[in-house]
Design a protein with these regions (language model features):
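Soluble catalytic domains of membrane acyltransferases
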Residues: 27, 44-178
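A transmembrane-helix-recognition feature enriched in membrane-embedded lipid enzymes
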Residues: 2-51, 76, 97-106
Length: 178
């Protein structure tokens, strides 16, 4: 694949009209605490197998993108990556306790779907700009189709984020049977 010129990269990144909030994004302490026991818990009641883990960068900003079958998927992706991932998540996950506490205190990004998720995309910018990992489900919701095509149409957020950060690797993750 040919590389884009610097002028082309500059045009691409400016044309998506995506900027951050300017606020520092940190991985909260609760996320770090959960990293200590969630992998053991997940392995105790699931039969998870991973392939291709050698393709996951261990340093720098990364966009993790993939299908979404169940509420376990973010945990599975974090377990596979062995890195903190900050996911774009629908506002419904932030409305009631204890979910709200967990989502806020593990660094997940609240996405208001009806407004197009502009605030969430700005926070996604902040995550990547600071060299952290972003998780996104391009369909914007869980896949519930039982026959081909299994996936729903994707949203534009992943394309806009990837265009704004063309040097950040996008790691596709496929989950079966969650």
């Amino acid at each position: 694949m040919d590389r884009l010129s610097e002028a082309s990269l500059k045009f691409l990144t400016s044309s998506v009209n995506l900027e951050g909030t300017g606020k520092k994004f940190k991985t909260p302490a609760l996320f770090k605490f959960c990293e200590a026991f969630v992998p053991t818990l997940m392995r105790s009641f699931t039969n998870i197998h991973f392939k291709g883990l050698e393709n996951i960068p261990m340093n720098g900003a990364v966009i993790f993108s993939g299908n979404h079958l169940s509420n376990l998927d973010p945990f599975i992706k974090i377990l596979a990556s062995q890195r903190p991932i900050h996911f774009l998540a629908k506002e419904g996950h932030f409305q009631k306790q204890p979910n709200r506490f967990i989502m806020k205190n593990t660094g997940q990004i609240e996405t208001f779907r009806k407004s197009g998720g502009k605030d969430a995309l700005a926070r996604a910018f902040d995550v990547l700009d600071q060299g952290l990992c972003l998780g996104i489900f391009p369909e914007g919701t869980r896949s519930r189709k039982n026959s081909p095509p299994y996936l729903q149409n994707g949203k534009t957020g992943i394309a806009r984020i990837a265009a704004r950060f063309p040097k950040v690797p996008v790691v596709p993750i496929c989950i079966n049977g969650s």
